[in-house]
Amino acid sequence: MRLASSSTSLPVPAAGHHPLPLTVGVLGSGHAGTALAAWFASRHVSTALWAPADHPGSISAIKANEGVVTTEGVINGSFTVSASDDLLAVIRSSHLLIIVTRADVHDSFVSELANFNGELAEKDILVVCGHGFSMKYERQLQCKRILETDNSPTTSKLSDKKKCKVNIKEMKASFGLSCFPIHRNDVGVIDLPEDIKIIFAQLFTARIIPIPPLQVLFFSNYITHAVAAVMNIGSVRDPVNSLTKRAEQWLLELDERTPRAETGFFFYGEGSNTYVCKVQEQIDQERRKVAKACGLHLNSLLQECNDEYGTDYATLREYCLAPSPHNVHYACPDNMEHRYFSEELCSLEDIAAIATITKIEMPLTRAFINIIHAGKGNFPPTDKTSSVIGNFRSGDLIRFGATIFVKDEKMK
């Protein structure tokens, strides 16, 4: 199936308030960005795809392939998007701009968008895996509203060297969505505006749960990713040119005697064994205690995992061993700049900053922050945070959805 849409000319929306047909601009062409662009095209949504010039994703390959993205998995076929390197044209052509990139490079995307603030006044910006995007950047972007998902709506992976083919392994059964400025229904409960509900019904089949922007920041990905990555840090190869010649020779000899697995490493199935899962559950307790101090009720890590995939795993270890979607491809950090270290460090530090504001102790979480900094060579690790949330006060948290502050209340 191929949708008739030029890879060079961008669709121009009619004037007015989010008229149909909907047009979207996906900013970021990595695994998730490419998958979502193809998914939207499969749902007959006119889709433009943009990425910065130095982006390592698929944009150049898709442009060379005349905008065609081939998918396998949940959907199978070839779909055409408008691949563009002209951000202004994408902004003007789109009702909804969708940022799909690592949280640790949000700064650069915001800088690009801020150059066109005059064009953003009537635009909504959706940030996939928001990591507290609205809390950090709402003053820098003069857009209509900032929407954030708590997790990626898709589990996907670019599956060919040309980067024009993507395996969409799963589309999530549910995910949380926030809106800033916060919208409440007639009885004062946090909700989504009606026009946003209409748009998301067109984009996704998932059950979408309205949540406050603050709750997005608490999503548990950092636990499943960073904790397992740190506890398997010995599997990460030494940095290039970091070894002496003698050490390099000995490493080669070790590899010859006991070769590292040629087939790869299943990060979830092999990297999150029973002992790692126990640590993850303890860090989850710290996460939920800090959230509760802000008036937020969070499900357990295991329940969040089951909710997003519509599954009924009895234990976290069972979830990590399930064949699909996390044990379909080998995926393990190969350096300290991998997102499981660098991106999730942002989440760890954000939540630690909130813990400081709410005066809740989270020693295990802070230990992982320090270990990641130490592994990156940032000596000595300190309690100082690079998170802008470190400058917040309780009133700032209330603005983004906190309601109460309770110190040291024991989790049940």
Swiss-Prot record:
Keywords: Crown gall tumor, NADP, Oxidoreductase, Plasmid. Homotetramer. It is an enzyme of class 1 (oxidoreductase). It comes from the Bacteria. Belongs to the lysopine/nopaline/octopine/opine/vitopine dehydrogenases family. It catalyses: D-nopaline + NADP(+) + H2O = L-arginine + 2-oxoglutarate + NADPH + H(+). Its EC number is 1.5.1.19. GO terms for biological process: glycerol-3-phosphate catabolic process. This is D-nopaline dehydrogenase. It holds the Pfam family NAD_Gly3P_dh_N. One of its GO terms (molecular function) is NAD binding.
